[in-house]
Amino acid sequence: MEELFSHTFKALRHELGHDRPCDSRPMWQQRQSADSDFCRALVSNGYMTEAQMQHAVQRYHLGCSRDGGVIFWQIDTLGQIFDGKIMYYRPDCHRDHERHPQWVSNRLKHHYLGDDKELIASIPSCHCLFGTHLLSEELIVKSEEFATALESSVSGSPVGNSQLYTLNSQLRPVAVVEAEKTAVILSEHYSAYLWLAAGGLFELTAEKLFPLHHHRIVLFPDTDPDLKAYTRWYEVAHEARRLYGCNVTVSPLLELNATPEQKQRKIDLVDYLFKK
């Protein structure tokens, strides 16, 4: 029996890539890497410089699977991992549609539960917006600015109460897009916003917008010929305002400016801004 357990744990360590002493760090820290095909494609296609790409990896804790896929971790404001989406990209930085996205949670379920489909289906997976952890990091930065201003005020520096209030309350607005790729790229080029991603048109819900309710929120759905994406997200925004009092709007930027051909291709904000 002891020998059986020994072989089992040895195989498990090999499967998870831990043929070394046990690593107690969170999973996203263990897997954080700029070596994915996605990260290399960002630079080679001119979306980012090498330095910008490294910043984005740190910002979103991007990971890399053994087979070169990028791991988009979904981490909440408390630093808890909800899940991780493994996606594959071609050298031109477009999705490799021959390789379907996979969830880290599903891989773990299959690893530990085998082929018991009924048991696997009975264990739900919870998701949040990609980039949700940035909200708490933003709050920490603003709190430190507030503390510094308060200290200056006490020591006699001419910092008024209104200025203290501004430092404490003006959090950056949040932009929500469909694709994780879009959020990653635009975070380096339009840093006046915090960039989050729903992970798909139908992945955005009012509940997922609740953690953002202290921020001004702007939704940027992809475009299409029939306004389906815009209408869908407009309904979600209305529900978030009704349930949680969110200050949320849906940007008509793509609907007003995209050409009929671009709408037919269902472009997103990166496609429009970079025109690649």
Identify the meaning behind each predicted range.
Residues 1-82, 115, 275:
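TOPRIM metal-binding catalytic domain and adjacent DNA-binding surface shared by DnaG-type primases
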Residues 8, 26, 124-127, 138, ...:
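Serine/proline-rich low-complexity intrinsically disordered segments, especially terminal tails, linkers
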Residues 13, 17, 21, 33, ...:
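Intrinsically disordered, low-complexity regulatory regions of eukaryotic regulatory proteins
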Residues 20-21, 96, 226:
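Intrinsically disordered, low-complexity regions enriched in Ser/Pro/Gly/Gln/His and often acidic
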Residues 24, 128-130, 248:
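Residue-level detector of bioactive/disordered segments in secreted/extracellular proteins
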Residues 28-30, 56-60, 89, 100-103, ...:
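Aromatic side chains
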Residues 71-213:
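Phosphate-handling DNA/RNA-contact segment within nucleic-acid enzymes
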Residues 147-149, 171-174, 180-276:
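TOPRIM fold recognition
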